[in-house]
A protein has these predicted regions:
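Gly/Trp-centered helix-boundary motif
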Residues: 1-115, 119, 126, 145, ...
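Residue-level signature of the cytosolic catalytic core of signaling kinases
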Residues: 19, 81, 124-127, 155-157, ...
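Short amphipathic alpha-helical coupling elements at transmembrane boundaries
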Residues: 28-29, 87-94, 130-140, 151, ...
Length: 319
């Protein structure tokens, strides 16, 4: 009697063809949030102008043409010239680069400081949490712009100092939001299980808690860029921000005050650029918040049942 050894054919691996997190987020943004999509387009144009500013500026941003000062828009100078004959378009494009550096750098520091303070406070709890939160309460009771004006009066006025000041001062206020997210995650059972099997507190914080508050951090980052750009422009307009040699949009608006009656376009172009960029970033940030935060979407998260499917499920169970 002979037996045949039949071997089952190896099962083919089923590939997961679902889109990645960011691609899925982009698809939902385009389909569900038209204003957010508009904001994303503004951000792309704004960042492209900042990154490639040296290649697309018609003239050097400090190049002076005294014989062509205070000219209106023309074929040579598309947006006109300022009081020293410098090309307004070139200075506006270079200002986008300054705003991009301030916005990204300061917001990155915002999130980093918020994680260091908020995650530590929320994870440790107890007296540490109480002491840290009382400090945050006192800090938030002082108007933020007053703090910025005071600090920038003492420190030297340059780009690095501006980024550090905006990043650190803004990050302390954001620590409370990170703390709330950490406390919500810390109550999950897998955190207790990780502690029970001997994981160190640092490993639990870095491996299990921080990755799970990424939606909160992404929302903080996208909403913070516009605020930091606006803060830098406000400080520079008042004379407490960047020095006149750096053509940020706030500096351009400040230098145009003496010519508002005769040449209002000197303030018009940087004002429009500032308003449009901040509006676009805020619309994009609001849309990302709505898409990532289930509480703002009626409790329906990415992997939850929609209202329609939930009703269908209840109807089938009732039968």
């Amino acid at each position: 009697m002979t037996t045949k050894n039949s071997s089952a054919a190896p099962a083919k691996r089923v590939e997961d063809k679902r889109p990645g997190f960011f691609m899925d987020l982009l698809r939902r943004l385009i389909l569900e949030k038209p204003l957010g999509t508009f904001g994303l387009g503004v951000i792309i144009i704004f960042f492209a102008a900042g990154i490639f500013s040296k290649f697309i500026m018609p003239f050097g941003y400090q190049q002076i043409h005294l014989l062509e000062r205070l000219q209106g828009p023309s074929a040579k100078y598309l947006l006109g010239t300022d009081e020293l004959g410098r090309d307004e378009l070139s200075r506006l494009i270079y200002g986008a680069r300054i705003s991009m550096e301030v916005g990204l750098g300061a917001t990155f520091l915002n999130v980093l400081v918020s994680i260091l303070i908020g995650a530590t406070s929320g994870f440790l709890g107890g007296k540490t949490d109480m002491i840290v939160q009382r400090f945050v309460d006192v800090w938030m009771s002082i108007p933020g712009f007053v703090i910025l004006l005071t600090v920038m009066t003492i420190l030297p006025r340059n780009l690095i100092v501006m980024i550090l000041v905006l990043g650190i001062t803004g990050g302390i206020g954001g620590a409370r939001l990170v703390r709330s997210a950490v406390i919500a995650i810390k109550s999950n059972i897998y955190i207790s299980a990780s502690d029970a099997i001997g994981c160190s507190p640092m490993r639990i914080l870095l491996v299990h808690i921080i990755p799970n508050i990424m939606p909160t951090l992404i929302i903080m980052f996208t909403l913070g860029i516009g605020g930091n750009i606006l803060a830098e422009a406000g400080l520079s307009f008042l004379g407490f921000g960047l020095p006149p040699g750096i053509p940020s949009w706030g500096v351009l608006i400040n230098s145009s005050q003496a010519y508002l009656q005769t040449d209002p376009q000197l303030a018009l172009w940087p004002g429009l650029a500032l308003s449009l960029s901040v509006f676009g970033m805020n619309m994009f940030g609001d849309s990302i918040r709505d898409l990532l935060d289930p509480r703002l979407r009626g409790g329906v998260g990415r992997y939850s049942l929609s209202d329609k499917k939930l009703k269908q499920l209840k109807a089938s169970l009732a039968k």
